[in-house]
Amino acid sequence: MSGATAAAEPVLDAIEAGFDDARLALEDLVRIASISADPDRAVDVQHSADATASYLESCGLEHVRQATAAGSPPAVIGEWLHAGPNVPTVLLYAHHDVQPPGYEERWTSDPFEPVVRDGRLYGRGTADDKAGTVAHAAMVKAWLDTAGALPCNVKVFVEGEEEIGSPHLAEFLAEYADDLAADVLVLADAGNWSVGTPGLTYSLRGLAGGDVTLRALDGPVHSGMAGGAV
């Protein structure tokens, strides 16, 4: 067993022991209808940012604060930077906003009242992506509780507008470049191959926008004379 593996064993045990507490924290976050696509839910998005910040602090992250740029919904930033200047810094990303529930009559239960069925937790945001926030923070807590320190410097960035395409992300990254500077980014917002089989995703397509201009004829023509034979 390598030294790194041996050091991680008690952390994994702590994660297992704290699983129920992490699930309860996730349920509390899921109960907040932080739908970034709905302007009428702006208060809920703010409430979600408040709850996310409180949870990060409770897990031992420091200098936790909310941040906005160019009128964006609130994001949450936190950090733990005591591993030393010659140790890599890892940026952990998640988002606290969610998609609308869609046709609520098709839900078996209230989308914003999490329930456990057959060993699985159901509710809007249980996977995408409030689980990512909890996974990151619970991992930090497990390391601090067992080892007293993290093996690397850690920053956490929990976005508030991912589900609408992150329209202010460029401005946000420019304004908070120093706060988010890191050697590697870990994103807790991808898929697994199957239940119990994790996947390691190393690239995502992202989004690209643009304008398309079409030019047609100056005037109408007879389709039988100008059209081609098909």
Question: Language-model segments: which ranges?
Answer:
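Fold-independent oxyanion-binding glycine-rich loops
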Residues: 94-96, 118, 160-161, 188-191, ...
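Acidic/histidine-rich catalytic neighborhood of metal-dependent amide-processing enzymes
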Residues: 121, 125-203
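Short small-residue beta-strand/loop micro-motif enriched in glycine and branched aliphatics
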Residues: 121-123, 218-224
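Acidic-enriched catalytic cores of C-N bond-cleaving enzymes acting on peptides and small amides
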Residues: 193, 202, 223-230
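Flexible glycine/proline-rich, aromatic-decorated loop/lid segments
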Residues: 199-215
